[in-house]
Amino acid sequence: MRWIEEELKRIKEANLYRERILLEGVKDFCSNDYLGLRKHPEVVEESIRVLKEAGLGSGASQLVSGYTKHHRELEEKLAEFKGTESCVLFGSGFLANVGTIPALVEEGDLVLSDELNHASIIDGVRLSKAQKRVFKHKDYEELEEFLKKNRKKFRRVLIITDTVFSMDGDVADLKRLTQICEEYDCMLYIDEAHTTGTIGKGGLDYFGIEHKEYIIVMGTLSKALGSYGAFVCGTKLLIDYLVNKARSLIFSTSLPPSVCAGAKKAIEIIEENPKLIEFLRKKEKEILEILEQFSLDYKYYSTPIIPIMVYDEKETVRIKEELLKEGVFIQAIRYPTVPKGKARLRLTASLNYTRKDLEFLKNALEKVLKGRA
């Protein structure tokens, strides 16, 4: 297996080597637990209650015997939360994308995908065998110009975008995209993994858009909702279709009931506490005040994803490792997660952070960045 050694050597030489880190005695400043619900007492208590009632796992796929009242109740809650008719659960965001996209388009169809979409979208498009065209990030003029010239060549067209982009934190213009879809008869697939609970209920709610039959809303339970798994929301017709066609749903064991119960409780907490989003914005501003003290090159779009741009892969890894020595973990994000030369430290805001935590972050940055140009 010499080839594996050689490939790993190449990865290390390019400063792209990855490894898992046990975060013991370290403060995490890059998790996706944006609202701090992962350890919320009510979420944990509800999960434990259902764990004792229903057991550890679901025991089967949804289409065999792994579909319980807890799955259905979560689906109903998600559909209501997203303003759609229906919903279906998936084992993860990756499984949702690689299962749903190939069910919607195939050979003879066209996918138009934003260049910064998540890797699971890229793989879902590959599996679909539809023709793919990647458009420049949020360049909707390019997108529309292509459709003007080429829409009639294809049977079905699916436009795909993250709503909040996972590595930059900026927001897609869903108003513009819905206008394009209506004018050129396209479906719109929005990935709301980092959107649900961070800018409101979701992108449609944020932009004041009523759900239409051509809009497919995908999201995860594992970010702001603090749980695990994913979902797709849409019309009842669409969901019935996915239950019959999405292979990653059909051939996967369903989520544990306790996970579903915890996610449902998290949504209820968000609904009961609308100011959580406002508190998150305040936490983001506190982080920005720290970053400003060090004249760092960062991006901020009023979402909890605040990447510190370093650009050079080797330097990004060095800063990450130095921060880790100080007890602060901010992951170095490099190619292929982001384009080459766009390496960054993916700092995120969370309601978990106390004033003491942010002071700790500030002191660590001061030590590590001292003397850096």
Swiss-Prot record:
GO biological process: biotin biosynthetic process
EC number: 2.3.1.47
Matches recorded under PROSITE patterns: AA_TRANSFER_CLASS_2 (PS00599)
Source organism phylogeny: Bacteria, Pseudomonadati, Aquificota, Aquificia, Aquificales
Descriptive protein name: Putative 8-amino-7-oxononanoate synthase
Record Pfam families: Aminotran_1_2
Pathway given in the UniProt record: Cofactor biosynthesis; biotin biosynthesis
Top-level division of the source organism's lineage: Bacteria
Similarity remark: Belongs to the class-II pyridoxal-phosphate-dependent aminotransferase family. BioF subfamily.
Reaction equations catalysed: 6-carboxyhexanoyl-[ACP] + L-alanine + H(+) = (8S)-8-amino-7-oxononanoate + holo-[ACP] + CO2
Residues where substrate binds: 18, 118, 337
Post-translational modification N6-(pyridoxal phosphate)lysine, affected residues: 223
SUPFAM superfamilies: PLP-dependent transferases
Keyword tags: Biotin biosynthesis, Pyridoxal phosphate, Transferase
MF-aspect GO terms: 8-amino-7-oxononanoate synthase activity; pyridoxal phosphate binding
Co-factor(s): pyridoxal 5'-phosphate
Positions annotated to bind pyridoxal 5'-phosphate: 93-94, 166, 191-194, 220-223
Annotated function: Catalyzes the decarboxylative condensation of pimeloyl-[acyl-carrier protein] and L-alanine to produce 8-amino-7-oxononanoate (AON), [acyl-carrier protein], and carbon dioxide.
Membrane-traversing stretches: none
